[in-house]
């Protein structure tokens, strides 16, 4: 890359040879002390413990491979910091251990992370789930420390530990958060605060490494907070919190200030929260920027602050190296995004730890569905990828998921309603992973729809059924047509309805043709079209999160679109928990399981060709 020159190690040797001062302690004119700092970083890991297949036929991610690269980098730069910018959870089946085992934080401790911050997805289990996770992490750590305190422990002690906690993990990363705390009116405030204090969550900290005192703090962004509506936390102004932390850390002797921010960057300054933060606050040397899943090939430099992002899902380990002198002048020496791919060997200790997590998932979560982690459900002869950003067209994965919801409602829902017509809906924003060509497993199905937690307290949003008038159903189509260009996550995929729109027409008036369709689930997919009656009530099956978002359309469109989810009798829904679908055993019908069961029924025949190039659904002209 542009700034890749040579490692900090060789730079230090060269400077020492030229100026006869200790390595890393001179500048070009040999009059001011110069230090070299290396920061290794990730963000938005989303529980990607295991590698994922790529469209190119390779693999990306996996914590055992990440650990290998971390060790390799620290062999060259032993004083390097290792930090994370939040959203370390929610994205694979291992997240089902979040509240009970804290697998994410414990594994990050085993990989050598110094400090992390929290993101919106750490609150998918609500504020109480976050607190339970912290308590689980601390309990496991304390038990591990006690277990290892004496050289020879009885075998039964080790067996008892593993039965309760799984892997032995005596180290945890520091958890930093300076502007996000339980709201005063949160009824669980005392419990959450106690858990945070028990773990040792703090707003900022100093860390000495290689004779240098570093100051670190964590922040939650505006959009990130909005993406955590059930957190029960209150966010304070990021710039004010940052100024307070910088002042505190400087007072404690910090020479380099690092902000772990779950705020993100955007295409413009107005949408780039971390650029605004750097502009508003002096004294921050580095911002590790998470939330927007950005991959910055070069650091952004704003107000003498390096803003760095390595991309999501453990795709890369970021490495930033810069020199600095006692006058505060910095010089970028090296910036790399190191791929975590199939060419990297797995670190055996982390690979073994991950296998233990997989076994626990099978015992505690998948068993109730009669599935195993790597069980093959069916196969596909083609890739099904998540939608491209701001591309308004049919998508095979979106169509597959919406069909799966409708199929599950008809097949698995214990109380399937005998309604005149049902439409199923999913949204771009909840599709979290691709389905690559080849064998499709239970874990892959979960990865696609891994968000959220149900009213039963277990991972995965449940399906819900609500009712919309025909006019409101058309309004939902208009959301797709008009809002998607500025908010790609709003793109919708429907089964049981189709529509066409023209992006050159007026905003919120782009849909010009809409109809209901029969869905047969045979090779033809759909047949017969019916007119939508504006005044009739139509049943809509979707995920809990998508239903909640549909309920915000009126306020988000400033009243231009009216859409209010209803009960079958036409009264407005006041609690979506009343709309959850259940299977014959009384279990919540989860989004991911609807997809898994739909895939499984294709068996050895594999996915039909219609999902390779879906012709039904929306059409842009």
Regions found by a protein language model. Give the residues of each.
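Catalytic centers of hydrolytic enzymes
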Residues: 29-38, 47-56, 63-75, 110, ...
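Short hydrophobic/aromatic-rich motifs at helix boundaries and adjacent loops
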Residues: 15, 102, 246, 291-292, ...
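Generic alpha-helical secondary-structure signal
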Residues: 9, 133, 476-479
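A short hydrophobic/aromatic micro-motif that marks alpha-helical segments and, especially, helix-coil
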Residues: 17, 102, 306, 484-485
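Acidic, metal/ion-coordinating pockets
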Residues: 26-343, 400-403
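Gram-positive cell-envelope targeting signals
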Residues: 1-27
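Generic detector of low-complexity/intrinsically disordered segments
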Residues: 13-20, 83, 518, 560-565
